[in-house]
Amino acid sequence: MSNQHTLLISNLLPVGSNISTWWNFGSMLLICLTLQIMTGFFLAIHYTANINLAFSSVVHITRDVPYGWIMQNLHTIGASMFFICIYTHIARGLYYGLYLNKSVWLSGTTLLITLMATAFFGYVLPWGQMSFWAATVITNLLTAIPYLGTTITTWLWGGFSINDPTLTRFFALHFIIPFAIISLSSIHIILLHNKGSNNPLGTNSDIDKIPFHPYHSYKDTLTSTFMLITLFIILSFTPDLFNDPENFSKANPLITPQHIKPEWYFLFAYGILRSIPNKLGGTLALLMSVIILTTMPFTHTSYVRSMTFRPLAQTMFWMLIATFITITWTASKPVEPPFIIISQTTSIFYFSFFIMNPLLGWTENKIMMNY
């Protein structure tokens, strides 16, 4: 009996031997989450959720609190790193057909939506000029909901405009939701290891598995170290790389910025929102830009799981990546030609991937059957 237990421990979490570096982003995300919760806790100690004091409290943290500037910048840059890792993680899932493990994919999509909500609440907290106006624009989209829109918006704001109650509840939500993210992440990991990881070939790994530790754990440590080195280089040399210049001014409801935009990691969804002139249509497109990921397990038609051996699907995938980057770029620009037409065109390309992918799978099946 003891020999069986020893064998179990030494072979704890068997993993396919051929999984590549793209499989390391899960552990990198775990490190990002830990970093965000730790720095967030120390920032919350000194932060004041009041519209008259919030901006000053952030300045106080940066200037007066010992190592406060490190905590504040780590939290800001860490959020960007988090989204870089999660978008890469999702892209890997799309490329290698990991969405066919439905429970893992759907729990991951839920995690993404929760993360985006948390990041949005956090962006409002410094109460800078861009924080205030981005919050006003995004929360105002709720008024597009027929019949209930205005009531829901007033309830969320805690009044008839964004004010002190709004900031207080956004701070409360930004503090509490990360604990829900920890729970969802645990569920995501449990569901994944219930069936086991896929591999770049999209084949069954049961005949060729090795223990996660020490083989893959060292591989994870390497990429995580590179990520942390990059994080600290940005922190040391260009700490304001991801910040908006407008956000260094205190929120002023009487002055509207020339160009309102959220953080860079929301720009793809914001670009899709802006490309549609109708408010309700834009809001639905914004929601669908993320929710459409949930359709992937149900629209896979190809006999082959991974895109490794699907050249047509690969072309569509890299078009999606190029589209994602282009939408992000256009959304950071003012609403004027040629950015309007570029944004509208790329939005069509973005959604067309989710329509074309099953059609391509069906076409590839036909080609394979003929040979």
Swiss-Prot record:
- Where heme b b562 is bound, by residue? 75, 174
For this UniProt record, give its keywords in alphabetical order, as a comma-separated list: Electron transport, Heme, Iron, Membrane, Metal-binding, Mitochondrion, Mitochondrion inner membrane, Respiratory chain, Transmembrane, Transmembrane helix, Transport, Ubiquinone
Q: Which Gene3D superfamilies has this protein been placed in?
A: Cytochrome Bc1 Complex, Chain C
Could you give one GO CC term from the UniProt record? respiratory chain complex III
Where, in this chain's numbering, is a ubiquinone bound? 193
Sequence intervals crossing the membrane: 25-45, 69-90, 105-125, 170-190, 218-238, 280-300, 312-332, 339-358
| Pfam families recorded | Cytochrom_B_C, Cytochrome_B
The positions annotated for binding heme b b566 are 89, 188
Major localization class: mitochondrion
Annotated membrane topology:
Multi-pass membrane protein
- Which PROSITE patterns does the record associate with it? CYTB_CTER, CYTB_NTER
Q: List the disulfide bonds.
A: none
Q: How is the cofactor bound?
A: Binds 2 heme b groups non-covalently.
Superkingdom, according to UniProt?
Answer: Eukaryota
Q: Where in the cell is it found?
A: Mitochondrion inner membrane
Q: Which cofactors are named for this entry?
A: heme b
Task: Identify a single GO molecular function assigned to this protein.
Answer: metal ion binding
Quote additional remarks: Heme 1 (or BL or b562) is low-potential and absorbs at about 562 nm, and heme 2 (or BH or b566) is high-potential and absorbs at about 566 nm.
Q: Its quaternary structure?
A: The cytochrome bc1 complex contains 3 respiratory subunits (MT-CYB, CYC1 and UQCRFS1), 2 core proteins (UQCRC1 and UQCRC2) and probably 6 low-molecular weight proteins.
Q: Which family does it belong to?
A: Belongs to the cytochrome b family.
This protein's name: Cytochrome b
Lineage of the organism: Eukaryota, Metazoa, Chordata, Craniata, Vertebrata
